[in-house]
Amino acid sequence: MAEWIAGGLEGPAGRGLDERVVRSGTTTVGLIASDHVILAADKRATAGFLIASRRVKKIVMLSNYVAMTVSGLVADAQILSDVLREEIRLYEMTNKVKPSVRFVASLLSNILFSSKFFPYIVQLIVGGYDTQPRLYTLDLFGSITEDKYTATGSGSPIAYGVLEERYREDLSVEEAIKVATTAIRSAVLRDAASGDGADVVVIGPQGYEEKFIPYNSLV
């Protein structure tokens, strides 16, 4: 996860945004396969050169059909996930129907964009299933892209190499999980801010399933 490093406070609205102040950790990946969305994320949180935790959950269930992976500042990610959960509940109570995954991602994009001069330091993946599997990537300014596969965090350049090589649209769910965990493992081997196994969430027409895969069992 991201950590604050001693340094100046240069940047918009006085918040430190240059590389001397903020460093990002984490590896999270998402992909669509066989009418499902697969999300995976490592378990390590860092504070400077210290491993602050080996048991962090970086995949947040926003409802029973949509989830979000987080990389960046822990506090920023927590407040955003809390806001989104409550907005989804409010929408369901008001409209008697669940909001689409696109609606959730667009709402998050609007929240991030509205704070662009005092931004949330996060990079996020939103994935879920409404009438079909959906996968979106968002940066700290609210830019949003829809993808078949994606990765975020400091280990993402390494993870992308695996995804580019192994992703196919006809992957089964089990094959997609192996691709995702292989991408996480490859990043963990080279990125000091990622490690300690992976959480995996699979979301499809019948709901969602979560599981933890220890590092030694990552493909």
From Swiss-Prot:
Pfam families: Proteasome (PF00227). One of its GO terms (biological process) is proteasomal protein catabolic process. The active site is at 26 (nucleophile). Transmembrane segments: none annotated. Component of the proteasome core, a large protease complex with broad specificity involved in protein degradation. The 20S proteasome core is composed of 14 alpha and 14 beta subunits that assemble into four stacked heptameric rings, resulting in a barrel-shaped structure. The two inner rings, each composed of seven catalytic beta subunits, are sandwiched by two outer rings, each composed of seven alpha subunits. The catalytic chamber with the active sites is on the inside of the barrel. Has a gated structure, the ends of the cylinder being occluded by the N-termini of the alpha-subunits. Is capped at one or both ends by the proteasome regulatory ATPase, PAN. This is Proteasome subunit beta 2. It comes from Aeropyrum pernix (strain ATCC 700893 / DSM 11879 / JCM 9820 / NBRC 100138 / K1). The lineage of its organism: Archaea, Thermoproteota, Thermoprotei, Desulfurococcales, Desulfurococcaceae.
